[in-house]
Amino acid sequence: MLKKAYKFWFLTGSQDLYGDECLAHVAEHSKIIVENLNRSGNLPYEVVWKPTLITDALIRQTFNEANNDPDCAGVITWMHTFSPAKSWIAGLREYRKPLLHLHTQFNEEIPYDTIDMDFMNENQSAHGDREYGHIVTRMGIERKVVAGHWSDERVQSRIASWMRTAVGIVESRNVRILRVADNMRNVAVTEGDKVEAQIKLGWTVDAYPVNEIAEYVAAVSQADTDALVDEYYQMYDILLDGRDEKEFRRHVAVQAQIELGFERFMVEKDYHAIVTHFGDLGALKQLPGLAIQRLEEKGYGFGGEGDWKTAAMVRLMKVMTEGMKDAKGTSFMEDYTYNLVPGKEGILEAHMLEVCPSIADGPIGVKVQPLSMGDREDPARLVFTSKTGPGIAASLVDLGTRFRLIINSVDCKKVEKPMPKLPVATAFWTPEPNLKTGAEAWILAGGAHHTAFSYDLTAEQMGDWA
């Protein structure tokens, strides 16, 4: 999914007031911290040690080198000793990437029997980090602050979470969204200022005529289509529901052809997310369903009915969770209908076709069923129920004067009974702290009916991204 192996620079602040021996210790301690962080196995990206920063010029130079290194996704700063914060102003003013302030110290415990003023001067992060933190706050620079000993797994976990957010921020500046169709007519929340999105978020949002992309679909060879259909038949349960087997396979093959054609178009033109709309399908024989689900599982973002904002968020949230151990999945989602029985409240989540199978719990089936919208033949889709457990639903909306990111923690549950007549993938969740409060707050905030949903991210991470 990612085209580069991102790294994070570790910048240690000090000053020349304490002498060469002290500065040698500072450098040695910083190297030990970096080596141990990398060996811990708890961080998703490599930390790179940089020489101790003690002058205005070197600080400014290092921050600009970080700006210009495409593999650097952010910097971690730490003041081992006192480091006069005015020395950091020029560098911080010009820095353009995510920033984490690690408020730690080399030693975990005060050496009660041997501590003297040399030790105090050398190990005064409690002093130096406050000086540095003050200037960052005064300059109005957004950053993450993580406090605690660097060897503590809880501290490492918070660094790891921030790293994923930082990569989301950096990748956001390169996201390219393909609009296969315009927004659904008369729908408000899927609209938005695409120019402002490029200015504020870095997103490129381009539209192409549906039939230009349909030409790529039509150009897919029969051999390639058959090979992908065979893969589907090996991976998923085939749920004929009384349909003729040959006719069923032909419908599935249409989706295979769409998957291959769409992906070739997106790879050729370097797009990372895609939107479709059932009201504008051109020469496509079916509304893309199974095809979109498969593309989402590969890491592409998706939004229904032209919802490019949600498509970009799904892409970014997939990037942020890439390589995560025991990941449970990320998907495009839509609020559909409520269960309002006291004690059993929740929202049944689904969409017409395009929920990502990364969130599936148990077997995944292929169905071909009629779709009342789109005026095309019956589309094939993957059907499943989602995993249980905590997650987040995120909605980026355009309020006219600014964008707003709305995040709700949710608790995914199993539905009480099977739903044999519902031919789509589903999730069922209760918003935190409860359905009534969550729904009221969501509506007051202007949240959309579409969301980018993930089991693997937190509200804190998405708030940091925003």
Which positions does each model-derived feature cover?
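Long, internal scaffold/assembly segments composed of regular secondary structure
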Residues: 231, 235-323
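Extended hydrophobic packing segments that form well-structured cores
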Residues: 375-466
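Short beta-strand segments enriched in small/hydrophobic residues
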Residues: 2-25, 174-183
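Short, well-structured alpha-helical segments in soluble
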Residues: 59-72, 89-91, 259-268
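Cap/lid and interdomain-hinge subdomains that line or gate substrate/regulatory clefts
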Residues: 44-45, 103, 108-243
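Short catalytic helix/loop segments, enriched in acidic residues and glycine
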Residues: 24-40
